[in-house]
Amino acid sequence: MLKLFSAFRKDKIWDFDGGIHPPEMKTQSNGTPLRQVPLAPRFVIPLKQHIGAEGELCVSVGDRVLRGQALTRGRGRMLPVHAPTSGTVIAIAPHSTAHPSALAELSVIIDADGEDRWIEREGWSDYRAHSREALIERIHQYGVAGLGGAGFPTGVKLQGGGDKITTLIINAAECEPYITADDRLMQDCAAQIVEGIRILAHILQPREVLIGIEDNKPQAISMLRAVLADAHDISLRVIPTKYPSGGAKQLTQILTGKQVPHGGRSSDIGVLMQNVGTAYAVKRAVVDGEPITERVVTLTGEAVSRPGNVWARLGTPVRHLLNDAGFCPSADQMVIMGGPLMGFTLPWLDVPVVKITNCLLAPSVAEMGAPQEEKSCIRCSACADACPADLLPQQLYWFSKGQQHDKATAHHIADCIECGACAWVCPSNIPLVQYFRQEKAEINAIRLEEKRAAEAKARFEARQARLEREKAARLARHKSAAVQPAAKDQDAIAAALARVKEKQAQATQPVVIQAGSQPDNSAVIAAREARKAQARAKQAAHPMADSAIPGNDPSKAAVEAAIARAKARKQEQQAGSEPVEAVDPRKAAVEAAIARAKARKQEQQTGSEPAEPIDPRKAAVEAAIVRAKARKQEQQTGSEPAEPIDPRKAAVEAAIARAKARKQEQQTGSEPAEPADPRKAAVAAAIARVQAKKAAQQQVVNED
């Protein structure tokens, strides 16, 4: 029948699947004009009354404010809120707001002074002289949001539309039972609404502007037609009454025949929709220079004696409005904010009116009926037939109860408009909308947690990348600041490397151990002492010019001293005296060193010509001969045997003697002798010891 009816109409309309026809109950409140409500003594203004983040506070406790003064700053999607009247800010604290759970949100609490003084208002009567961006910014800064129930910032919505909007739809359907706020506003302020529509059309520049209104509002239709009598830029479309024809997607399909895709928006098909109350607020913001500080609210239900529509200041407590309407609560009285299908019950009556509050319903017990017990689903599919969004509420119900979030998402639970049509027709009295709301809240919480985790991961990776960049920069700075070694340093490095290679080559040579021989480290010790002596020789800065006297050869002096000591001991033994203490080779070496030192001192004092350089190998041989003679002499005396001579210590003493001899050579100013090979020195020392033994034996034979 609807299709047959629309075929004869000049302006074609379409239909959507599903929908219901509940009792309208609109005549209780749409018969009386709009009226003002006395100011409440205290106002509670939540900072967040829209979709998006709350704005930044710009007032403090104790500040005096005027009506229309901004309480927060609007940046991006943050919509500012304004003072509903003049007064004093007494607190900025969390307060229960319009929410099913009465959640507390940060609010500005103002004590009214009763004067209701405005800020200085500056209207743009010639709005066409201003740019599109300036108009959008003014609408945003004056706090205009969608007053049809969504609360989306109007300025952001207009900015996002851009140049792709071809159809502007003004939603005047107001399909939910009991609510008549838009109906009464169109009856009393039709001209201002049309002017606001023209401002929106000037900003968007669409090809067509359509007003969709249900046929159950004859007075409002008459007023709009009277205002649009000579207008050709706006078309008024009257549609059949059907719930929920006021839904954005449903009204778009009715007026244009286009369906919004799943998960998409109406702007994806070139359509932008605004509510008639939003159009009126746009006119007051642009032309009159008045921020949104009040809105029309329907007060209805059998529990109020004076139902109707009132201008309610934002932040007015619900209790104050109901008392003005003659509220007579019963024992178990409920108050619903919104309509009976999409609204929610208020936990208490001190919550404030906000921008999305369009109705306060106070029904009697008989009016709402007794609560029904929830029963099991009988799979009758009545909910699927009534769903206007072409969903499967029965399946979504099972997925919601089973916490199957992935399947619920796959069945487009996000497209549910929560109209309540499925719950209305359910024979088992299952509150399907409550299950769907809870499921969508859980899915949103999961997505929010995943988003936070992704952001935290991105921050961590960015930090790691920054640390790597800083590390690379530090290394680059260190490399650029490194000083290249000088030529002499390079020579020293090359010499050190050569010494290391020589040591490694020496270490790789095989060590031959003869059978029956004892370990002898004299060669290694002699080599070490030779290297130390060579290093000390290189470090000498000023070699002495004086030379030694040939007659004062320290090695010869040491030999003579040792021979003298041996003869003295032999003379004592022959004289029949007590045996003398055995000769300690270490003491002998010390005495020889003292004698050599005295000899060197004598050489320096004489200042004679430099003597022939002392050969350390010869000195070692002579010292070995002296030690051999001394040992032979001790054996012949028949005294107690002395402490055996340690070959290692003897080698050390020989090395010390050679090192001192080389130092003496350098100090005398003579040409440096060829550096001694430690292996050759050790061999020479061994040969010297053998020769000393043979000489001692020969001397004994001669004496006998």
Swiss-Prot record:
Family: Belongs to the 4Fe4S bacterial-type ferredoxin family. RnfC subfamily.
Gene Ontology annotations for the cellular component aspect, listed alphabetically: plasma membrane
Location in the cell: Cell inner membrane
GO MF term (any one): metal ion binding
InterPro entries for the chain: 4Fe4S_Fe-S-bd (IPR017896), 4Fe4S_Fe_S_CS (IPR017900), Ion_transpt_RnfC/RsxC (IPR010208), Nuo51_FMN-bd (IPR011538), Nuo51_FMN-bd_sf (IPR037225), RnfC_N (IPR026902), Soluble_ligand-bd (IPR019554)
Species: Salmonella dublin (strain CT_02021853)
Purpose: Part of a membrane-bound complex that couples electron transfer with translocation of ions across the membrane. Required to maintain the reduced state of SoxR.
Top-level class of the enzyme under EC nomenclature: translocase
Family annotation (SUPFAM superfamilies): alpha-helical ferredoxin, Nqo1 FMN-binding domain-like
Pfam families: Complex1_51K (PF01512), Fer4_7 (PF12838), RnfC_N (PF13375), SLBB (PF10531)
Domain of life of the organism encoding this protein: Bacteria
Record membrane topology: Peripheral membrane protein
Chain positions recorded as [4Fe-4S] cluster 1 binding sites: 377, 380, 383, 426
Subunit description: The complex is composed of six subunits: RsxA, RsxB, RsxC, RsxD, RsxE and RsxG.
Protein name: Ion-translocating oxidoreductase complex subunit C
